[in-house]
Structures are given as structure tokens and as C-alpha cells.
UniProtKB/Swiss-Prot annotation:
PANTHER family: MALONIC SEMIALDEHYDE REDUCTASE RUTE-RELATED
Name used for this protein in its record: Probable malonic semialdehyde reductase RutE
Induction of expression: Up-regulated by the nitrogen regulatory protein C (NtrC also called GlnG) and repressed by RutR.
EC annotation from Swiss-Prot or TrEMBL: 1.1.1.298
HAMAP family membership: Oxidoreductase_RutE_HadB
Gene3D superfamilies hit by this protein: NADH Oxidase
Phylogenetic classification of the source organism: Bacteria, Pseudomonadati, Pseudomonadota, Gammaproteobacteria, Enterobacterales
Organism (species): Escherichia coli O17:K52:H18 (strain UMN026 / ExPEC)
Requisite cofactors: FMN
Pfam families linked to this entry: Nitroreductase
Primary role: May reduce toxic product malonic semialdehyde to 3-hydroxypropionic acid, which is excreted.
Amino acid sequence: MNEAVSPGALSTLFTDARTHNGWRETPVSDETLREIYALMKWGPTSANCSPARIVFIRTAEGKERLRPALSSGNLQKTLTAPVTAIVAWDSEFYERLPQLFPHGDARSWFTSSPQLAEETAFRNSSMQAAYLIVACRALGLDTGPMSGFDRQHVDDAFFTGSTLKSNLLINIGYGDSSKLYARLPRLSFEEACGLL
């Protein structure tokens, strides 16, 4: 049986964690990015399909390639973030299933149904983006996930000639708490959940 994590860990991962829009000028090392992936990859996905592919943008050149795709409200926070992750999904993720899910012919489930393949890739890469956020928080980093961008521009700028398609962006770094907005409410259990 698993042990519950400490109240402090729950605060770090959930109740005290915030979406950041401003960043301290503290770099995020490539080794830390590897640690993030080393944690997030263990999050469950359907048939272990693991469709997410991540591009960590760390350079000014990379940010300039990304700039035209950003909405005005996301521009400054992204250009000043130490790292921006493009979380994409591989439209041919099923080609790795003989390795990732050797228990049966899972590849054929998706090659026979392009719609199922796309739905599975998008849904599961979205889950993996959430795992990335939790991994960042566990390592003492802050994040700012965003969907306000031109996906086609990102795909053209970063994924031309590949099987990858962008899902969302996540800014990563050490947040400047002085630039946080007031904490917004969340729905109560009664508003969001049901018991049957």
C-alpha cells in the first residue's frame, strides 16, 4: 500500500502552488529538465502509449521563433521565462507500442482507426502535460501553462516534416511571487462532483 505524502508535499504540489506570470532571473539547467522528464514519464497513459513529445525552449533564438505564435497576453511572460516547454503529441505514437506495450498488438488498435489514434494522442499528451507540471513543482520549480497561441504557427515553426503537433505551452522557472494575482476560487466538491 502506498503511503500518503506529507502535508508539506501536498502544499507544494497543489494547495499552495500557483500559476506564475513573472520570473526571477534564475536559470533552469539542462540537468533539471532531464530530472523533470525522468519523473513525468512514469505517469500513466492509455496502453502506456506515451504520446507526448516535449521541446524545451531555452535560448533567445528559440523564443524568437515562438514569438509570432503567442497571444498578446502571453508574450511577455513567455519571453522572460527561463524555459518554455512545447508539449506536443506524436500522431504516429503507435509505432512505439511494440516496445512500450508488448502484451498484445496494440499498434493495430490505432492504425485501423485514425480518429481513435488522434483522440488518444491528444488526450494522453494532455495528461502528460499535467504530470510535467507536478514534476516541476516537486523539484521546486514554478510553471505557467498556456493554450493562448497559434498552434499552426508553432507546428510550422518547430515541427515541419515531422509527425508532431503542438498541444500546449508551459513556462517553467522560479516564479516572482510579487507578480502573482490574487488567488482565484475553485469549484466546491458539490459543484464539481457527484456520488452514485
